[in-house]
Amino acid sequence: MCGDSTVEANVRELLGDRQAVLIHADPPYGMGKEKDGVMNDNLYREKLDEFQMKWIKACRGNVENNGSFYIWGNAEDLWRLWYCGGLKDSERLTFRNQIIWDKKSGQGMLSEDFRMFAPATEHCLFYMLGEQGFNNNADNYWDGWDSVLSYLQGEAKKVGLNPSLLKEICGVGNFSHWFTKSQWVFIPEHHYSKLQEYFGRDGFKKEYDGFKKEYDGLKKEYDGLKKEFYATRAYFNNTHESMTDVWEYPRVQGEERWNHATPKPVDMISRIYKSSSPDDGIIYSPFLGSGTDIIAAQKIEGDRTVYGMELSLEYIEIILQRWQKFANIPAKRIN
């Protein structure tokens, strides 16, 4: 669709009531290339952050609550957006990676006037909506453990057990894990027995087998809740190829650039799709550019649908030309 991705009404017109599971965005980098046809590229620092937050908020109503975002940009701008630009605190988000695209064609600069190392990479911020990690930190402590933990805490207080004494008795420094809500885990039998032996009749009088049975009953309920939680997590599949957060793809050159300022390799975008969207997933591209996102979906197995927004009429023509050349079928205007 030819429209403005920072306008919620335009996004709603494109997507309707559909919910995207993946947002792949290659927005303006703030490199001052408006004269070269890159709209909104003369925005810098806080103005660029405002622009980024505007398009993110505009599409949020059409994104699944466990969706994933991939946003390309300069490293400094992406980190400022995350920490200072309002993104990190906009809702509950889970940072995943700063993906580095190694373009394999960097060339050093032998110049006294060049005050930095020559860049040969581009960067992508990858995050997921919602709480994605099921951990047992104090903030995520499950209240169902209270009956077990309260007994342990009560016995420890009664006999004066502290971290240093525990280490003396058991040889490990696990006081916070066994007797507080911070990363709480159930105490192993051999350590519990050492406490019973050390304190005798003064504390830890419950027999371990019965105590463990009580814990196992609670754990069954906990595991059920954990399973339900995992079912709500963002889609992610890293089994289709071996990957790290450094992606090695040659830079796009020649006619394959399609007159775009920061073109991405089709196969690299396909990797994102395979990793963060199911075969029938809906993907939204708020800056469609030369249409790479559409081609990337067509090159892989599955029935993914890409909905793209592009502000420039010039690029709309390029997208249509490129699609028709790739698919060998005429594009159809719907509205």
Where are the regions that the model predicts?
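Core catalytic lobe of class I
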Residues: 1-316
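Conserved phosphoryl-transfer catalytic core
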Residues: 324-335
